[in-house]
Amino acid sequence: MIMLIKVFVLLLVVYILHNSYKKYKKLDKNELKGPTPIPVLGNLHQLSSLPHRDLSKMTKDYGDIFRVWFADLYTVVISDPVLIRKIYVENHESFRDRPKIPSMKYGTYYHGTAASMGEDWVRNRGIVSSAMRKSNIKHIYEVINNQVDVLMSTMKKYEKRSEPFEPRYYMTKYTMAAMFKYIFNEDIGEDEDIHTGEIQKIMGPMNQVMEDFGTGSLFDVLEISQTFYLKWLELTEKNFPLLLKFFNGRYEQHLETIKPESPRDLLDILINEYGTNTHDDYLNIASTVLDFFFAGTDTSSTTLEYLFLMMANYPEIQDKVHQEVKSYLKQIGKDKVELNDRQSLPYVVAVIKETLRFKPVTPFGVPRSCVNEITIDEKYFIPKGAQVIINYPSIFENEKYFKNANQFDPSRFLQTTTTNTASNEESSFNSNLAFIPFSIGPRNCVGMQFAQDELFLAFANIVLNFTIKSVDGKKIDETISYGVTLKPKTRFKVLLEKRLI
């Protein structure tokens, strides 16, 4: 027994020494600055329940690009839009992969658009982009437009009854129903409860996955535990199998009824594009569909929830939006906003952009991995295998790019330049160029246009028809809750008052 203890202690000492050497050794003369790590944990002990805030504070000490250790995962944090473009656009080939960690591998095994790597990603991106181009634009518009009609009908019922309206519930239903129609050509009834109906079959497991993986796990980034952690997930995690079971039912139905020459929805198009010859084809289709649900519902619904919050807290801005929409529609003789009205409603677009900036939904986006060691601008060395993340809140709160960044001011997106208040000099960087909520480069959000259309149509028609007020006449709490997405901490409700159009 004593011998076993001695062996264990010896192995532990060797492990800690090896782990320390890895973290403390000099990599390159241009290696990035960063906080001093400790063995095993790296810099994890310096992160709180709001890690994006902690990393933003580190920016003040180490600059707009620095390194931290998430246990054994060397991570590069970037808060400079110029450097982001040099990395994600000019050197895209070196940063197109995802980190090889258990949570990224589990469930999809690097299939689909979000998790695939290398040439597999090139093929997947090409197929999905082609599939989306083949989706009839008119059909996509009708999908979103019909869901807006359903949403307006529901909100009118709440307004007539003078009942508080919960944005989170109904914005989730709106985005989920649009995705069901777009991908599966299925209609979700206006009266369907998202906690008991068809939506719940995918939303329940999705929410649990985001809750389980959203805050990260030490075992994910501790090299010694990664193999065991992946096996643990495969044996105990129940939600991804439920998601695949849900998808498989739709997939089998589509295989039985598909007419390749006249696809009904995105799933039909994906089946046509990928084929059904191998299990890899199936996994790519399944993973791509789930990618759309994960990326295209929670982020859009949360942004709409924030729009409700900001309109209730900033009634003067809400009135300005309403006046712009009402005046424009009166001029052209319509009573509803359509997609082709977007260019004529710049303030509506500016409010959506400012909400995405002021209340960013994703703190870091989906991380990238460095394929080969590289030096950016001859002074920023990034080693092979490094994880790369963008700290969006740090960029969006930076006075260098957004004057009076702590103020909710949509008019900034109606201007062409910003002023650097620190030096009182005009910034050479256009605020719109620093505004990258959907990431940039070849691996940016593939569903960006769909999301923008969803947001614009819903928001413009909501403010056209209703005045949004807090239930008690006070400002709604804007505190956030950290996870895969940054949501309002409180599931708030609002009162709706009918506007005269």
From Swiss-Prot:
Keyword Ubl conjugation set for record: no
GO molecular function: heme binding; iron ion binding; monooxygenase activity; oxidoreductase activity, acting on paired donors, with incorporation or reduction of molecular oxygen
Entry's EC annotation: 1.14.-.-
Family, as annotated: Belongs to the cytochrome P450 family.
Protein keywords: Heme, Iron, Membrane, Metal-binding, Monooxygenase, Oxidoreductase, Transmembrane, Transmembrane helix
Cofactor(s) needed by this chain: heme
Residues noted as binding heme in the record, renumbered to the chain: 445
Predominant localisation class: membrane
Record PANTHER family: CYTOCHROME P450 508A4-RELATED
UniProt name for this protein: Probable cytochrome P450 508A4
Gene Ontology CC annotation, any one: membrane
Pfam families linked to this entry: p450 (PF00067)
Organism listed in the record: Dictyostelium discoideum
Signal sequence, renumbered to the chain: none
Compartment annotation: Membrane
EC class name: oxidoreductase
Transmembrane intervals: 1-21
Topology of the protein relative to the lipid bilayer: Single-pass membrane protein
